[in-house]
């Protein structure tokens, strides 16, 4: 398919998760806004907690979100399913909040999303970047951590994912607090 406004060849994607508003997100943090200005799309991997977070993010770029274990009907009503599968710049991206325990995670996500090239997840608040050890597979799973609830991590984080011509061009974890 040739590139169009809906299916460009290259996308800059901001990736966030576990914002846990209003406890940890009192409003769009300026550092988060700085990092997300200019992205083409935002992916939120759940635990939004209040839909106003999504409204703030949507003022910067279109948002796709999945439900987290702390999200209720109001976040679901914003349009958040439990899982989501998208094609972005020719890359098949799946989203889920909880990808389960570290042990066997890539295999589990491959079974759950057999057609995905990338799975974005959250829940642990721990940044993660892992690629299948199977050379014939290539599934990559990514967790941006949390920009606002770092837990035992040294910094709050989000991710920049650049997708181009059916491949991941880059993944960068950005410290925002």
Give the ranges of each region predicted by the language model.
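Active-site neighborhood of phospho(di)ester-bond hydrolases with catalytic His/Asp-centered motifs
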Residues: 15-17, 41-47, 63-69, 95-97, ...
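Residue-level detector of beta-strand structural context in well-folded domains
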Residues: 83-84, 127, 159
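N-terminal active-site segment of His-dependent metallophosphoesterases
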Residues: 1-63, 71-82, 90, 154-157, ...
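Glycine/small-residue-rich loop that forms an oxyanion/phosphate-binding "nest" at active or ligand-binding sites
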Residues: 64, 69-70, 75-95, 100-112
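Pre-active-site segment of Zn-dependent metallo-hydrolases
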Residues: 19, 24-35, 95-114
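Short, conserved loop/helix-junction motifs that constitute active-site signature segments
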Residues: 57-60, 88, 110-114, 133-136
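Active-site environment of divalent metal-dependent phosphoester hydrolases
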Residues: 20-25, 48-53, 70-76, 100-106, ...
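Binuclear metal-dependent phosphoesterase catalytic core
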Residues: 2-10, 16, 88-89, 111-115, ...
């Amino acid at each position: 398919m040739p590139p169009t406004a809906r299916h460009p060849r290259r996308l800059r994607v901001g990736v966030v998760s576990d914002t846990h508003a209003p406890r940890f997100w009192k409003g769009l943090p300026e550092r988060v806004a700085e990092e997300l200005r200019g992205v083409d799309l935002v992916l939120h991997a759940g635990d939004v907690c209040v839909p106003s977070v999504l409204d703030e993010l949507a003022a910067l770029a279109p948002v796709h979100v999945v439900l987290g274990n702390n999200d209720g009907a109001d976040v679901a009503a914003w349009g958040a399913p439990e899982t989501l599968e998208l094609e972005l710049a020719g890359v098949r991206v799946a989203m889920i909040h909880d990808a389960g325990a570290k042990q066997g995670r890539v295999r589990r996500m491959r079974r759950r999303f057999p057609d995905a090239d990338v799975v974005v997840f959250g829940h642990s608040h721990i940044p993660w970047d892992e690629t299948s050890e199977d050379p014939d597979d290539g599934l990559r799973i990514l967790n941006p951590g949390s920009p606002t609830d770092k837990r035992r991590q040294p910094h709050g984080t989000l991710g920049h994912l650049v997708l181009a011509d059916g491949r991941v061009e880059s993944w960068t974890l950005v410290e925002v607090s």
